[in-house]
């Protein structure tokens, strides 16, 4: 029972870190990268679909992105979605592809994005702590029901604390790396 609770908590923490990586990956940096478009969606025949599934996204230069829709009919919808996104870019459409020039970030915008990255990191750490709290409650229930002794539960709680600390540290490192990437000129 204890091993099950610990395994389940670690699995959930692993998923939370994966979500944190994806969230931080969507924060725009000064360089062009296909990941910055992962959160942009359009209405594609009645279903909300990420543009990454509707077009190929290439980065031929450090500050240039080319988006080539698989269906020409979706060109304008994709262009509008990119323009209306929070990326702060202005796409240009030449009839078959969309070119996006990624402007240099201003100091003010960099600081804004660092705050955004830190906020996403903090949200991830809160998620990890909530997973830990639920697992601790489960361990307490196991002890209360007499399925495990006090010593076993105590060891499991220490193990859970170590696991939580490991994943919190991972999130902190991800945020630190993103911050360095953003502040790089």
Swiss-Prot record:
Pfam families: RRF. It is found in: Cytoplasm. Keywords: Cytoplasm, Protein biosynthesis. InterPro entries: Ribosome_recyc_fac (IPR002661), Ribosome_recyc_fac_dom (IPR023584), RRF_sf (IPR036191). GO terms for cellular component: cytoplasm. One of its GO terms (biological process) is translational termination. SUPFAM superfamilies: Ribosome recycling factor, RRF (SSF55194). GO terms for molecular function: ribosomal large subunit binding. Responsible for the release of ribosomes from messenger RNA at the termination of protein biosynthesis. May increase the efficiency of translation by recycling ribosomes from one round of translation to another. HAMAP family: RRF. Belongs to the RRF family. This is Ribosome-recycling factor.
